[in-house]
Amino acid sequence: MSAFTPASEVLLRHSDDFEQSRILFAGDLQDDLPARFECAASRAYTQQFHHWQALSRQMGDNVRFSLVAQASDVADCDTLIYYWPKNKPEAQFQLMNILSLMSVGSDVFVVGENRSGVRSAEPMLADYAPLNKVDSARRCGLYHGRLEKQPQFSLESWWAEYNIDGLTIKTLPGVFSRDGLDVGSQLLLSTLTPHTKGKVLDVGCGAGVLSAALASHSPKVRLTLCDVSAPAVEASRATLAANGLEGEVFASNVFSEVKGRFDMIISNPPFHDGMQTSLDAAQTLIRGAVRHLNSGGELRIVANAFLPYPKILDETFGFHEVIAQTGRFKVYRTVMTRQAKK
């Protein structure tokens, strides 16, 4: 994190107004403004492990990563600055959670890019903190209101589920493919053969659908699942439990918290981080896989056909093959051999 996002640049136009504020930063925290903003006190709360990693280097215990905010995250804060994400249900989940903890009378600021749908904040918060638009610049909107009524928030009411091939998939707002199995994952699933054995790592596990489907027809696999998203980690745990499956699930920025080597790594890697296109996670996945695959171990990923993954696969492993494809997606497979660049 270094350069400020357009949303942060809009906030900086009003920096003098915040000098006496005790601020909680939350939402899509794509830069380190929470650590550098001049104010009376600054805290940050995030559901994204990689955002917590970056901010904790400067903010220490004043930034926290978890599924839901707690009273301690809001302690003494009189102002919320919320960065609007591209996912509206995710925004609603987070705002209802945070505002249920903040004191009536607190200042509420919502900032985000117009293309992210930040305008939806006005009707969403109309009953709790009626918003007015106070600035428009850098293709972003900045809204302000005061908390008039705390919303009710119960985590249980936000869970959803769907069924696929006899499996129950548990989901939460902010989890990839929350409303059903996406086409890319479906294509990757079609390539997983029954009676797979060994240790399997599912990177960017989402709701845990890939691992659950694999384990349902390959009961001897030993599953490890990870994701940067706190809702995804909790959803994957719930999916495994709902189907009587076992596996280790934890938060990790690709391989940052992963220990050991595996016989197979599977992934439907993201190529967006918030509103921005980013291949960083997928490149880290491919290049880092050589340090986490056993000899003869396999990396199998699905991706949009236009993304430049074949080049990275060949540079890292020496070869790749396409084992399934549609007009939009391809499933790539490569194997850990002596020619892989460790």
From Swiss-Prot:
Enzyme class: transferase
Cited SUPFAM superfamilies: S-adenosyl-L-methionine-dependent methyltransferases
Reaction it catalyzes: guanosine(1207) in 16S rRNA + S-adenosyl-L-methionine = N(2)-methylguanosine(1207) in 16S rRNA + S-adenosyl-L-homocysteine + H(+)
Pfam families: MTS, MTS_N
Record keyword Transferase present: yes
Cellular compartments annotated: Cytoplasm
Binding partners and assembly: Monomer.
EC number(s) stated in the UniProt entry for this protein: 2.1.1.172
Record-stated family: Belongs to the methyltransferase superfamily. RsmC family.
One GO MF term attached to the UniProt entry: nucleic acid binding
Signal peptide: none
UniProt entry tagged with the keyword Secreted: no
Superkingdom to which the source organism belongs: Bacteria
Name of this protein: Ribosomal RNA small subunit methyltransferase C
This protein's UniProt keywords: Cytoplasm, Methyltransferase, rRNA processing, S-adenosyl-L-methionine, Transferase
Function recorded in the entry: Specifically methylates the guanine in position 1207 of 16S rRNA in the 30S particle.
